[in-house]
Regions:
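Alpha-helical transmembrane segments of multi-pass membrane proteins
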Residues: 47, 51, 124-135, 181, ...
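Function-critical hydrophobic alpha-helical transmembrane segments in multi-pass membrane proteins
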Residues: 117-156, 165-166, 178
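Juxtamembrane helix-loop-helix connectors linking adjacent transmembrane helices
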Residues: 70, 79, 94-130
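Core segments of transmembrane alpha-helices
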Residues: 87-96, 103, 172-185
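Alpha-helical transmembrane segments in multi-pass membrane proteins
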Residues: 29-92
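Hydrophobic alpha-helical transmembrane segments
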Residues: 36-44, 86, 121-125, 175, ...
């Protein structure tokens, strides 16, 4: 994949560098300085384009704009999410470059030619299971009190998420959670185009679990409904694609609470609507009856999550 990143952008860099220098360090395609710089800038720019395009399409065409009036939505949250994401990207790209550089030098198991179409489902499944497991444990590790406050808390600033929350991380947090995807192709063979598609799909999935569109209340697939609980209550649903490791690790929480067939987010949505129309006369949070304005009851959800937080 690194060779494509360089090859298709070489003409742009050739033209730009030839305007300002004659040094082979920047003009030669074999120069490590040029390769490292080009990889870094490409990762930064393409990462930003993918993030802004994916999150913006979601935000303007699918995201419920009413969510912006939610009492737990922060002032200027969308702007702050975009700022943190774009601020982090260049740093994330710096530490990501070695993965691409050593891939270019032939250390990965990526390959160009497919021998059989059966290699696709096998590699997809392997990539999916491998990253699902490691992202779970890395994410859970980031909730350890020794690192949580400086590393992962920035992402938990957002109690109610928007599509732009997806990459709104500390740069090392975003990098840490992307490492399993990079590591996979150093351990297992994968067809290059499939890796590229999987990598983009991973980014889009990240956006989708923050977009407030609860398309699934599936028991196996980890959706936005589950990740919403993670942002509100901290100690549940650390997974990325499936609920498997949350179940094994004892951190699974179903989006269905006390009421059969009634989803947690639906309760929040109703309470939000009630707030917009005045006061609610009763709120059921965590099975306890509470009375008062919606802001109070939803704050109680977050407060209970805070009380319950014990790192692991
Ligand atoms: Zn988290
Ligand atoms: Zn999140």
């Amino acid at each position: 994949m690194a060779d494509w990143l360089l090859y298709y952008t070489d003409p742009v860099y050739d033209a730009a560098f030839s305007l300002v220098t004659e040094s082979p360090l920047l003009l030669s395609h074999d120069s490590d300085v040029r390769i490292l710089f080009q990889l870094w800038l490409n990762l930064t720019v393409l990462g930003a384009i993918l993030y802004l395009a994916g999150a913006s399409v979601n935000f303007y065409f699918f995201f419920d704009q009413e969510t912006l009036k939610h009492p737990k939505m922060l002032k200027n949250q969308v702007r702050r999410e975009i700022y943190l994401s774009l601020e982090s990207l260049p740093y994330t790209a710096i530490v990501t470059v070695p993965w691409f550089y050593f891939e270019l030098k032939g250390y990965s198991k990526l390959y160009d030619t497919l021998d059989s179409w059966w290699e696709i489902p096998g590699a997809m499944l392997g990539f999916f299971l491998f990253t699902d497991c490691l992202v779970y444990w890395i994410h859970r590790g980031f909730h350890h009190p020794s690192v949580y406050w400086w590393l992962h808390k920035p992402h938990h600033t957002w109690k109610v998420c928007t599509p732009y929350s997806a990459l709104a991380f500390h740069w090392l947090d975003g990098y840490g959670q992307s490492c399993p995807a990079h590591l996979y192709v150093y351990l297992f063979p994968m067809w290059k185009p499939l890796y590229m598609v999987s990598f983009v799909a991973l980014q889009l999935w990240s956006i989708s679990i923050h977009d407030g569109i609860y398309i699934s209340n599936d028991e196996i697939l980890l959706s936005c409904a589950h990740h919403t609980i993670h942002h509100l209550e901290f100690n549940y649903n650390f997974g990325q694609y499936t609920t498997l490791w949350d179940r094994i690790g004892g951190s699974y929480k179903k989006p269905v609470q006390e009421f059969a067939n009634e989803m947690y987010f639906d309760k929040l949505k109703r309470k939000k609507e009630a707030l917009l129309h005045g006061k609610v006369d009763g709120g059921d949070v965590g099975g306890k009856q509470k009375t008062g304005p919606i802001a109070t009851t939803i704050s109680a959800v977050a407060a209970e999550g805070m009380k319950a937080r014990r790192g692991f």
